[in-house]
Amino acid sequence: MDKFIIKGGKRLHGEVVISGAKNAAVAIIPAVAMAESPCRIENVPNISDVKLSARILTAMGATVRWLGKNTVEIDPTTIHTNVVPSELGRKMRGSYYNIGALLGRCSKAIVPLPGGCDFGVRPIDQHIKGFKALGCTYSLNDGMIEVSAKELRGAHIYLDMVTVGATMNIILAAVKAKGLTVIENAAREPHVVDLANFLNSMGANISGAGTDVIKIRGVEHLKGITYSIIPDQIEAGTYMAAAAATRGDVLVKNVTPKHLESITAKLMEMGVTVVEYDDAVRVRCDGPLSKCNVKTMPHPGFPTDMQPQIAALLSIAQGTSILNESVWENRFRYVEELKRMGAQITVAGKSAIIEGVEYLKGAPVRATDLRAGAAMIIAGLAAHGVTKIEDIEHIQRGYEDIVEKFVGLGADMYLMLDPTNSDTAKIG
């Protein structure tokens, strides 16, 4: 299998440009299905999850053209089915956004139960609750969920928990429903706002995105537009953590500093210097890292998608830190991999107690999921010796050109291709 090989101990320095937000792109691309003319989406991250989102539309009949590396033009007028192919949809969790988009397009969707990273049961009960409130019925058959409505009607929906996926999926389904839909206890993440901005640019009538009450007044038509996706908050946070872990000095460009405030606050608490500019942040770390307690929370709290990366950083901080995961269950599987490198971490339920060590040691490790893989890279960059990371396909789902970007910052890192894999052995 392909691997990332990292020789640690080099301070990162220089500039890195952040790509478009994965979590926005995987909802915006399915949303194009509701447009009555082609859309051009810019600042699209060139990653496998996004390519898969586009492949799903192609399989349903849409005309998809890539105009360079980070721009895609999609003509949805040729879509001829409301069924997402099982072999594609099962590969990623974000495939469930096709339910909301297809409901908006034709009031019926047949989509495989979602895949993606496995942090537990990943229930979609809040999605179903929203769809039922809008007038839908649903059934499950052979791993496929079928959702349909004779007519979508606006409704008042209270989410039992703050959930990004359900918030965005209900927005998609409600955009063309008759009347007013109100979502209470809605997620406030930047990618929720980006989806709403995209839909409003198409002609939707959505207000309150970025607050916990979102109102959607249904419209009849959505037009094709050109739209640029926001920068990726989690990719930016990953490079910020890597700069701190290696005692580096890195300018992280093409970011929205306000989206990074919770990450910035914790880094500064650990003794890292962070300077904000209009569309960049500079991260510099000269001395030892201090212990810090972190609890993941829905936005604007500390993001769960940065939890593994901050754990890698805390593992080399002075003192004892406590990391509490309040969003996902079963998100500490990567801890065993960090322990292979010498980290001293004890997991108790939804908390990890991290005793900082002077340094980590390079070792063979696995990327157990997307963000855990990013944590392994950070640990490898800071470690003494060589780290070999397997199962890197998880990392490639969410980070564009990650090797090239880290090498550009001075890292000693490369991709080792599996010579027995005929697909990858041809690369380069």
Write out the residue ranges for each language-model feature.
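Short, structured segments at the rim of ligand-binding sites
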Residues: M1-G428
